[in-house]
């Protein structure tokens, strides 16, 4: 999310820019995501895409993309996961600690494969202690994750 189809770069190796406007995305790339949401998709992966028309930050760090577009406008209520955080689109520009905090602030629930898990966890703990991230924000993610685990039969 929000759609890698109209790009020529690979976020495994560097930054990827989506040059479409938000209206163009709504008319193209967002259509299958909306269909999935309408059909009851439980999880959406946010790709390491920079959609310049929406935000200068990569999508996993963008409150405008994760919370305002995906959750509020498109009505997604499930779990949001990042693409692999070991990919160069992320690691060339951000530490694991920065990635963790920025993604959670944007509304992401799960962080996939941070290079340095310990520093990511420490940064999140410190962000909560300092008030940079509220406990309520973490509780939202925990609730969504537990609901998905329950639905999948992973909790008894």
Please place each PLM-identified region on the residue numbering:
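Second-shell residues forming the walls of enzyme active-site clefts
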Residues: 1-126, 132-137, 144
């Amino acid at each position: 999310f929000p759609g890698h189809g109209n790009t020529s770069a690979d976020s495994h190796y560097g930054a990827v820019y989506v040059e479409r406007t938000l209206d163009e995305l709504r008319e193209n790339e967002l259509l299958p995501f909306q269909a999935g949401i309408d059909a009851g998709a439980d999880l959406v992966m946010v790709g390491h895409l920079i959609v310049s028309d929406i935000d200068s930050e990569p999508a996993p760090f963008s409150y405008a993309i994760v919370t305002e577009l995906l959750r509020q406008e498109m009505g997604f209520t499930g779990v949001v996961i990042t693409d692999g955080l070991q990919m160069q689109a992320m690691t060339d520009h951000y530490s694991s600690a920065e990635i963790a905090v920025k993604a959670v602030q944007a509304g992401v629930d799960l962080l996939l494969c941070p290079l340095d898990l310990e520093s990511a966890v420490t940064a999140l703990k410190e962000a909560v202690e300092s008030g940079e991230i509220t406990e309520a924000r973490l509780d939202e993610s925990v609730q969504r994750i537990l609901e998905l685990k329950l639905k999948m039969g992973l909790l008894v």
